[in-house]
Amino acid sequence: MNAPVVGSSLMVVHDTRCDYGAPVAHAHHAAHLRPPEDDAQQVQAFELLIEPAPAQCQGEVDAFGNWRHRFELVTPHQVLQVRSTSRVTVAARFGGLRPEASPAWETVRERLRYVARASFEPAVEFVQPSPYVPWPEPGLAGLRAWAATSLTPGRPVAEAALDLMRRLHDEWAYRPRSTEVDTPLSTAFAQRAGVCQDFAHLLIGACRLHGLAARYVSGYLLTEPQAGQPALLGADASHAWVQVWCPGTPGVPADGWLDLDPTNRLVPAAGHIRVAVGRDFGDVTPLRGVIRGGGTHSLTVGVTTRRA
């Protein structure tokens, strides 16, 4: 059991509504909405409300160690509403970070290469291409060359990863609604603009194309309103950032994963709540399902993150 976490107490309400053009007779859904717990994050309370009421709902841990809820709906419906409420205490995770003291990136890359009869390194799973970060793909040929500028010979891996994050933030524009969930990564690369999902996938691709392990993080970000302005309910959104494997780096947990937020050009601290990790967005979708019936549908999502 993890020791009590001393840090910021945050409350997150995540509302999802799906309206269908015709009745749904039967549905199975999976949700990644419950935050995990570790030495820097502790869940004080979590509630999941589903309407219509599911015939069954169970929580489980998926292949990547994330909480996942599966539920079945047998009541005919044209509206599905899911609300998760989380109260989480979050502490800064990377105190004393010394990126310049991390191993050379080539040394880390060698640890991730296959060697017969060598012990298995779980981070290897996050070096390979994945559905949202594919290669070889002609439209991403330039991403490898772009990343090489940061990965100079002998450079400490955490220092290189931080430089990639900063360059990505500085050279790409954050542009809401410039891409969709299924927009190819090559489009975001070519137009030099995207949303947080694109920024995360681009940083992941830049690392993997050079043999480094990187994985996608879904979660929430506390966005403080300007002085004198009230927080807008539902104006926040789920957020995405990246973890790069930097083993042996002072200030990074023993598992070696360093969090980087390229959308905001920072190392996540007590304002970021992790929910799930995976190879890319497809592994950590907040809500997905298989339905019988329904016809056309529209999705509405609202997230409110505030201090508890």
Task: Describe the function of each predicted region.
Residues 1-114:
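Intrinsically disordered, low-complexity N-terminal segments that are enriched in acidic
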Residues 61-65, 77, 291-308:
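A general structural signal for short secondary-structure boundary/capping elements
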Residues 25, 29, 38, 55, ...:
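Short capping/connector residues at structural and topological boundaries
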Residues 3, 166, 198-295:
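Hydrophobic/aromatic-rich core segments of domains that either
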Residues 104-194, 281, 297, 303-307:
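Secondary-structure boundary elements
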Residues 18, 22, 31, 48, ...:
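Flexible, active-site-adjacent loop/turn segments at secondary-structure boundaries
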Residues 5, 189-193, 231:
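Alpha-helix N-cap/helix-initiation motif
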